[in-house]
């Protein structure tokens, strides 16, 4: 990709974030095109793509036969098919799995590294972009297309925009916003996704969790009314038999080191500490605080105390911007 990622700065929590333009180099784009695109994706992901309009984007999971997620995908309609955004570390294996049955369908599934992914968030993000585009997405119309650019709107943790565009437009946006916006890399977008409670599936956690263990049902990412898709039986069983005992949590506090994806944490039990959970992602903010996204039992007490293994500092549960009550 000739468009160069911006140098990293320590990420900031959404409440204090100045206007920021980010390169999303840790995320990657992929597409499916061809006459059978919708039918093919409908048989592969947890969301009901047949009901998706041009104005919508949604989170969906692509699972194995046991209902474990290869990845989650931020899906939107693109050309005569669909495009999706996922973590770069899982794109290649996810596409390999997705292509397994494609020989029988009129589809082309491919990575897309021609287009550039940018994020805009922080103070007056909408006003800054309103000077550059004739229409911006919103709650009512979450996807807007203009020329070579697709803009996706996100409400949480605070209004922000994901821009899928060509290199020329990415350079133009950078030139126009450089004076008023801070530039940062994808760690800032990752921090916002952790705050929003959007599950982050990197390679270490691919094939490990059913969608409900990462709150996908609370994020509108699972249809329990659509026809068959890979892993559906296990995903449905988790709902209707109450088989899922896990949930995605947001922790905040201090840690002398950042836990890595796939690592466990420790839960305080009286005077002792017990290993628990699986870390999906973690970021250190500019104020020194650490935010951690972790899958744990769904019955954790809200005042529980956690720590990175053998660390002297502690982490506590923070509320997510959505409810898990069904």
UniProtKB/Swiss-Prot annotation:
UniProt keyword list: Cytoplasm, Folate-binding, tRNA processing
Binding site for folate: 27, 189
Localization of this protein: Cytoplasm
InterPro entries membership: GCV_T_N, GcvT/YgfZ_C, tRNA-modifying_YgfZ, YgfZ/GcvT, YgfZ/GcvT_CS, YgfZ_barrel
Pfam families: GCV_T, YgfZ_barrel
This protein's GO CC annotations: cytoplasm
GO molecular function: folic acid binding
GO biological process, one term: RNA modification
Family designation: Belongs to the tRNA-modifying YgfZ family.
NCBIfam families per record: PRK09559.1, ygfZ_signature
Entry function: Folate-binding protein involved in regulating the level of ATP-DnaA and in the modification of some tRNAs. It is probably a key factor in regulatory networks that act via tRNA modification, such as initiation of chromosomal replication.
Protein name: tRNA-modifying protein YgfZ
Organism, as annotated: Escherichia coli (strain UTI89 / UPEC)
Recorded name of the encoding gene: ygfZ
């Amino acid at each position: 990709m000739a468009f160069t990622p911006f140098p990293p700065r320590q990420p900031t929590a959404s409440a204090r974030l100045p206007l920021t333009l980010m390169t999303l180099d840790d995320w990657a784009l992929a597409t499916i095109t061809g006459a059978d695109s919708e039918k093919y994706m409908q048989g592969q992901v947890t969301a009901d793509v047949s009901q998706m309009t041009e104005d919508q984007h949604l989170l969906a999971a692509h699972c194995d036969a046991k209902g474990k997620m290869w990845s989650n995908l931020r899906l939107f309609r693109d050309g005569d098919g669909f495009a999706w955004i996922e973590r770069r570390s899982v794109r290649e294996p996810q596409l390999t799995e997705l292509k397994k049955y494609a020989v029988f369908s009129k589809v082309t599934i491919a990575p897309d590294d021609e287009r550039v992914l940018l994020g805009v968030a922080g103070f007056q993000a909408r006003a800054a972009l309103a000077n550059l585009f004739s229409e911006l997405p919103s709650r009512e119309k979450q996807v807007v297309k203009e020329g070579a650019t697709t803009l996706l709107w996100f409400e949480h943790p605070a209004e922000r925009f994901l821009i899928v565009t060509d290199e020329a437009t990415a350079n133009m946006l950078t030139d126009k916003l450089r004076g008023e916006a801070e530039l940062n890399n994808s760690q800032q977008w990752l921090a916002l996704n952790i705050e929003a409670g959007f599950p982050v599936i990197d390679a270490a956690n691919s094939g490990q969790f059913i969608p409900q263990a990462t709150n996908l049902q609370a994020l509108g990412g699972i249809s329990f009314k659509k026809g068959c898709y890979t892993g559906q039986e296990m995903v449905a069983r988790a709902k209707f038999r109450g088989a899922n005992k896990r949930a995605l949590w947001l922790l905040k506090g201090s840690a002398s080191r950042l836990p890595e994806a796939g690592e466990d944490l420790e839960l305080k039990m009286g005077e002792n500490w017990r290993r628990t959970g699986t870390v999906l992602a973690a970021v250190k903010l500019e104020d020194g605080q650490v935010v951690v996204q972790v899958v744990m039992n769904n019955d954790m007490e809200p005042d529980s105390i956690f720590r990175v293994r053998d660390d002297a500092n502690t982490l506590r549960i923070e509320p997510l911007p959505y409810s898990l009550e069904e």
